[in-house]
Amino acid sequence: MFRGATMVNLDSKGRLAVPTRYRELLNEQSEGQMVCTIDLHQPCLLLYPLPEWEIIEQKLSRLSSMNPAERRVQRLLLGHASECQMDSAGRLLLATTLRQHAGLTKEVMLVGQFNKFELWDEQTWYQQVKDDIDAEQSTQEPLSERLQDLSL
């Protein structure tokens, strides 16, 4: 399980160094094989260990290519999916097109989200956190039943 937000730097080749605390787990889970794709709703990337991505691919394969909305999701997620292998120094090379899509330059936030990571431009991440907190504080919407059951 991945959790927490960590600032990492992209090097001049577009590689990010995976924090040490995740490397052993990623090597155990996927031998360092990862898949990166775009997020459909946020300006970030999604980074999955290969076995977790294969579960997503199975779900995508069950969607109908005859349904325009389902076809769009297949096209966006699969069409942008890029395999990346963690090297012996714990670095992942991110495809240029993916980095451009998410506006990633130098400072990147690696955000653990259970079975995957999100990759955000650092400033965009902090703005998103602010926007999310503001939205939670000002919302008039009733909490969903699942959120009501979430006791912190």
From Swiss-Prot:
GO cellular component: cytoplasm; nucleoid
InterPro entries associated with the record: MraZ (IPR003444), MraZ_C (IPR035644), MraZ_dom (IPR020603), MraZ_N (IPR035642), MraZ_sf (IPR038619), SpoVT-AbrB_dom (IPR007159), SpoVT-AbrB_sf (IPR037914)
Coiled-coil stretches noted in the UniProt entry, renumbered to this chain: none
Principal location listed in the UniProt entry: cytoplasm
Locations listed in the record: Cytoplasm, Nucleoid
One example GO MF annotation: DNA-binding transcription factor activity
Domain SpoVT-AbrB, residue spans: 5-52, 81-124
GO biological process: negative regulation of DNA-templated transcription initiation
Cysteine pairings via disulfide bonds: none
Pfam families from the UniProt entry: MraZ
Keywords on record: Cytoplasm, DNA-binding, Repeat, Repressor, Transcription, Transcription regulation
Matches recorded under CDD domains: MraZ_C, MraZ_N
Top-level taxon of origin: Bacteria
Primary role: Negatively regulates its own expression and that of the subsequent genes in the proximal part of the division and cell wall (dcw) gene cluster. Acts by binding directly to DNA. May also regulate the expression of genes outside the dcw cluster.
PANTHER family: TRANSCRIPTIONAL REGULATOR MRAZ
Quaternary structure (record): Forms oligomers.
Protein family according to the UniProt entry: Belongs to the MraZ family.
HAMAP family: MraZ
Name of the protein in its database record: Transcriptional regulator MraZ
Gene giving rise to this polypeptide: mraZ
